[in-house]
Amino acid sequence: MADEFGNGDALDLPVGKDAVNSLIRENSHIFSDTQCKVCSAVLISESQKLAHYQSRKHANKVRRYMAINQGEDSVPAKKFKAAPAEISDGEDRSKCCPVCNMTFSSPVVAESHYIGKTHIKNLRLREQGGVKEGMVNQAKKTRTPTVATKSDNKMDHSDRAKFCKLCHSTFNNPLMAEQHYAGKKHKKQETKTQIMTIYTSSGQTPAQAPIPLNLNSPMPGSGSAGKGFSCDKCNIVLNSIEQYQAHVSGAKHKNQLMSMTPLSEEGHQAVVAPSAIASGSAGKGFSCDTCNIVLNSIEQYQAHISGAKHKNHLKSMTPLSEEGHTAAVAPSAFASGSAGKGFSCDTCNIVLNSIEQYQAHISGAKHKNHLMSMTPLSEEGHTAAVAPSAFASGSAGKGFSCDTCNIVLNSIEQYQAHVSGAKHKNQLMSMTPSSEEGLPSAVGPSAFASPLSAGGALSSGGPSGRGFCPSGDLTPKGPSSFGSLPPLGSLLPPLYPPAHSSQPYVHDDTMSPDGYNYFNEDFE
């Protein structure tokens, strides 16, 4: 192998067996016939040895190795073409990067490296003191990793720049430590530790005793740190500190704590005995023996015992004594088998769900109508039109029947409106001829049912070819000229006048009650 490098772009390769053996003898500390320490290659044959030492890959690795260890006595200085002092900084940058321990085959590759992220990151670390200056110290540090690890282990719990006790994280340099302490993970762990310390040492709610310190809960530096937030009272694990805070301040956690001790608030003991709270359902809900239900939380339980349903169940166990209620419904209706299930009205044969519904029912029209249907009405005018038996008939409880009109009304109001209306009165009048003054006998129901004999031969559609009007007007008038009177045949003159008269036929019989004169225009 030649003793010198070229211009830095390539290394002169040994040619032939003698040149290879000479290279091995000159660099026996790194080369041998069976092993190349620079390439970490094991050579098992003569041909493999010659091929390896004459390869370009081996020459590049040797050049990189010498560039890194150029200050060591073990590497001969004659391997380089010129001394480092004779080489400018620009030429050094194009050959190798002492910061990243890299060599380059051309200035283009070197320039690409210097503008890359890796070089910029390593340069920043070196400027901040993370990477020691001097490649000799770097080489020693890389050659003795065991010693460095031992020294780091001694500083695990004392050097904050190399170890985080809270997160159990180690750092290679101060920059990594600063990034960690300013990061989200470390801040979250700090918040978690603070919250857990507060809730496990001095946290308490108004309705409970102080929570005892839980040794199994996540504490700073414990093994469970970073894996969740446990609540031993509710036997659950929360994923974040926000969820834990929401849980311990929520109703479920408070109910779980309160379910372990009977309630002592004023007013609750009178409604439900403490045994209902401390019963076998403790921790699973709050039972109300009166209503036979279980509530999920103390808030629901308090709302239940102060609500209408619970009060109605309590009232249903004792007959009502309010004025006016006992008269309509006997106390036995409340003490019957339906107690606790509703309020029954024997009058209407229905069951109400609450005392409010019952009170509204007995004061309503339906209940009053049923009461009135059991006794004949005594109001003036009603009994004359409808017999008392109409109220006490089989339709009682289902409506109010009118035998005159053969209909059934749903309420007493409808019945009263019916008997005072025109339809009912007309039905009564149609059963007996009217005798009121001024109404002709022909206007009765029979008058509309059949034409009179006087005009039986005429149709009711009015005269044909004859005119009739008030005061002798010759203009023919239709049936509407008579107002509300129907065009009856009895009001029309006969077809022909009597034979003994030559005067126009006007007879007293043709005078209508309204003063109409009926005549035949053929007889003038």
Swiss-Prot record:
Sequence ranges of Low complexity compositional bias: 476-486
Domain notes: The zinc-finger domains are required for binding to dsRNA, and also for nuclear localization.
Gene3D superfamilies associated with the record: Classic Zinc Finger
GO cellular component: cytoplasm; nucleus
Function: Binds preferentially to dsRNA, but also to RNA-DNA hybrids.
Record-linked SMART domains: ZnF_C2H2, ZnF_U1
GO molecular function terms noted in the UniProt entry: double-stranded RNA binding; zinc ion binding
Binding site for Zn(2+) 2: 97, 100, 113, 119
The protein's name in its UniProt record: Zinc finger protein 346
Annotated compartments: Nucleus; Cytoplasm
Binding-site residues for Zn(2+) 1, renumbered to this chain: 36, 39, 52, 58
Region described as Disordered: 453-486, 494-513
Keyword annotations from UniProtKB, A to Z: Cytoplasm, Metal-binding, Nucleus, Repeat, RNA-binding, Zinc, Zinc-finger
InterPro entries cross-referenced by the UniProt entry: Matrin/U1-like-C_Znf_C2H2, ZN346_ZMAT4, Znf_C2H2_sf, Znf_C2H2_type
